[in-house]
């Protein structure tokens, strides 16, 4: 196979729009086809031959050579107007800011406003009245709504859409944690560190549960996935704009986002959750177990690990109390708990495989995002 670009003769990347070209010429051809402005004619009798970028190139001659070498305009997908994006559905100020670095090769994402909002929630502490006579687990369950009523489908997911999901997940996790009374007695430094550690783990469990409920309500729904309260996507048809994350196309980086089998472990967790008829208390226990076990492993041997082990013990005792309060719940206690823990294990596998793919993407600069608080996005997939 030819190893040089047929247009500018630099090392080729592959076949683009019908010719063997480099990335630069492929991008030029795509822009040229999609542009609405008239192209200026050549000033040098249409005899330009050097398109390596060492001096201003003649776009007219470059386009003419692209056509001559076999590049076909009909193979370029015309940009469609963005419709039904998440920001159309949701109207609220952004707590996450996307900006370009000085060299314009990387995107800087400032989440400091979101951190400040989370800190405000933590400082407010647990809501009052907290629920007299209720266990920690029951109080945490009352703070999360897993209903998928009136869920709408989103056709396009953009960077702004992703930031809205992050905001919802981070703030929801902060409110959820404040319903655990022992959490509110921790030093604020540890509270914030735990929040920044587990918010994306809580997010995975939330989306698994919401997606399982959503799929029960729709026929032929194996591709439906809940991303935000009352909004979902179709993994087969919803468009994903990843320009905020990478310079590559979605098709080129899909593996790093979902793996070979569209995150088979997360899909397995959704399937497992769909087979269970879980109450809000049971769902909350499953979420708490996933979050605190993850944090315990991540901070093994530290004070945070000890705190997370204590929380798991408290909530396990609360779950036992919940089952023994009503003899009807104890009929398949062990079997149900086993299925719940299986779901937890699938999510943990999803986190581990995501970590491996993200490490590769970061190592080879496939992802071009830099965060103001990078510790918050460890194992988040970005």
Curated annotation (Swiss-Prot):
A zinc finger (NR C4-type) spans 5-25, 42-61. Disulfide bonds: none annotated. Residues 2-78 bind DNA. It holds the Pfam family zf-C4. Gene3D superfamilies: Erythroid Transcription Factor GATA-1, subunit A, Retinoid X Receptor. SUPFAM superfamilies: Glucocorticoid receptor-like (DNA-binding domain) (SSF57716), Nuclear receptor ligand-binding domain (SSF48508). PROSITE patterns: NR_LBD, NUCLEAR_REC_DBD_1, NUCLEAR_REC_DBD_2. Keywords: DNA-binding, Metal-binding, Nucleus, Receptor, Transcription, Transcription regulation, Zinc, Zinc-finger. GO terms for cellular component: nucleus. Residues 110-380 form the NR LBD domain. It is found in: Nucleus. Its main location: nucleus. The keyword Transcription regulation applies. InterPro entries: C.elegans_Orphan_NR, HNF4-like_DBD, NHR-like_dom_sf, Nucl_hrmn_rcpt_lig-bd, Znf_hrmn_rcpt, Znf_NHR/GATA. Belongs to the nuclear hormone receptor family. Orphan nuclear receptor. This is Nuclear hormone receptor family member nhr-106. It comes from Caenorhabditis elegans. The gene is nhr-106.
């Amino acid at each position: 196979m030819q190893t040089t670009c047929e247009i500018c003769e630099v090392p080729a990347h592959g076949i683009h729009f019908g010719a063997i070209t480099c990335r630069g010429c492929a991008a030029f051809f795509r822009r040229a086809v999609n542009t609405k402005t008239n192209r200026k004619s050549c000033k040098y009798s249409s005899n330009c031959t050097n398109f390596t970028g060492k001096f201003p190139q003649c776009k007219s001659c470059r386009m003419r050579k692209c056509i001559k070498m076999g590049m076909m305009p009909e193979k370029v997908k015309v940009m469609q107007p963005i419709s039904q994006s998440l920001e159309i559905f949701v109207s609220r100020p952004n707590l996450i800011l996307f900006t370009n670095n000085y060299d314009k090769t990387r995107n800087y994402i400032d989440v400091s406003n979101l951190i400040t909002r989370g800190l405000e929630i933590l400082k407010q502490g647990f809501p009052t009245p907290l629920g007299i006579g209720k266990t920690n687990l029951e109080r945490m369950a009352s703070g999360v709504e897993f209903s998928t009523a009136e869920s709408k489908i989103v056709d396009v997911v953009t960077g702004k859409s992703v930031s809205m999901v992050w905001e919802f997940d981070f703030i929801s996790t902060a409110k959820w944690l404040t319903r655990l009374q022992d959490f509110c007695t921790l030093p604020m430094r540890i509270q914030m560190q735990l929040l920044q550690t587990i918010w994306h783990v809580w997010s995975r469990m939330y989306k698994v549960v919401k997606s399982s409920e959503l799929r029960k309500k729709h026929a032929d729904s194996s591709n439906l996935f809940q991303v935000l309260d009352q909004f979902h996507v179709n993994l087969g048809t919803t468009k994903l704009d990843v320009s905020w994350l990478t310079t590559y196309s979605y098709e080129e980086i899909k593996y790093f986002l979902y793996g070979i089998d569209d995150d088979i472990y997360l899909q397995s967790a959704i399937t497992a959750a769909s087979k269970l008829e879980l109450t809000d208390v049971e769902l909350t226990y499953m979420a708490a177990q996933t979050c605190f076990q993850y944090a315990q492993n991540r901070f093994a041997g530290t004070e945070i690990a000890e705190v997370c082990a204590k929380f798991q013990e408290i909530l396990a005792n609360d779950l036992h109390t919940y089952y023994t309060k009503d003899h009807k719940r104890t009929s398949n206690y062990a079997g149900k708990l086993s299925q719940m823990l299986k779901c937890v294990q699938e999510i943990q596998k999803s986190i581990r495989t995501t970590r491996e793919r993200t490490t590769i993407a970061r190592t080879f600069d496939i992802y071009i995002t830099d965060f103001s608080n990078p510790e918050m996005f460890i194992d988040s997939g970005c």
